[in-house]
Amino acid sequence: MSRYRGPRFKKIRRLGALPGLTSKRPKAGSDLRNQSRSVKKSQYRIRLEEKQKLRFHYGLTEHQLLKYVRIAGKAKGSTGQVLLQLLEMRLDNILFRLGMALTIPQARQLVNHGHILVNGRIVDIPSYRCKPRDIITVKDEQNSRTLVQNLLDSSAPEELPNHLTLHTFQYEGLVNQIIDRKCVGLKINELLVVEYYSRQT
């Protein structure tokens, strides 16, 4: 199954805010309407919607998300928390959380087009897994820096999560540590996602 490229507002109206997909938010009152409908939802649908939230927020295909779930299941610790850490430490998401892109798809384009370096080397793989002490920089070329500067200027000022540091004037971000669960930028019940996949096998 490919990445979703359809109307974004349609998704947030059904699933709630998906900041990685779009900066738009559901209209006031839509949460109440969704809650009134949720009384009739089956447990399967609740798990499915949590899975879809995760998939659309991070811009993954079904195959990619399943792969991450399997990796998380083999790791030590809570499968759900490890899953979120894996997704949050992707390079495209790190750029998004640093404010260098307004959405994760936009961050993915920056990476694909060779605008981003990790530890001094161009990385053009959006799924690259960042590690503590990684230094993310924008390529030292005018078009790359102008592009990112415009995005930084356009992004709404938000407090950075504690696992990241941004040096705006150097066009540089630093990964301080693996992200804490409380700093994940999406309202999600990751256990329901894990449960969804465990029931599919």
From Swiss-Prot:
Ribosomal protein keyword on record: yes
A Pfam family reported for this protein in Swiss-Prot or TrEMBL: Ribosomal_S4
Domain S4 RNA-binding: from-to ranges: 89-152
InterPro entries, sorted: Ribosomal_uS4, Ribosomal_uS4_bac-type, Ribosomal_uS4_CS, Ribosomal_uS4_N, S4_RNA-bd, S4_RNA-bd_sf
Swiss-Prot/TrEMBL keywords: Chloroplast, Plastid, Ribonucleoprotein, Ribosomal protein, RNA-binding, rRNA-binding
GO cellular component terms attached to this protein's record: chloroplast; chloroplast stroma; plastid; small ribosomal subunit
Gene Ontology MF: a single term: mRNA binding
PROSITE patterns from the UniProt entry: RIBOSOMAL_S4 (PS00632), S4 (PS50889)
Predominant cellular place of this UniProt entry's protein: plastid
GO biological process, alphabetically ordered: translation
Subcellular location: Plastid, Chloroplast
Functional description taken from the UniProt entry: One of the primary rRNA binding proteins, it binds directly to 16S rRNA where it nucleates assembly of the body of the 30S subunit.
HAMAP family assigned to the protein according to its UniProt record, in alphabetical order: Ribosomal_uS4_B
PANTHER family, A to Z: 30S 40S RIBOSOMAL PROTEIN (PTHR11831), SMALL RIBOSOMAL SUBUNIT PROTEIN US4M (PTHR11831:SF4)
Subunit comment: Part of the 30S ribosomal subunit. Contacts protein S5. The interaction surface between S4 and S5 is involved in control of translational fidelity.
Family as reported in the entry's similarity comment: Belongs to the universal ribosomal protein uS4 family.
Official protein name in the record: Small ribosomal subunit protein uS4c
Naturally occurring in which organism (per UniProt): Arabidopsis thaliana (Mouse-ear cress)
Lineage: Eukaryota, Viridiplantae, Streptophyta, Embryophyta, Tracheophyta
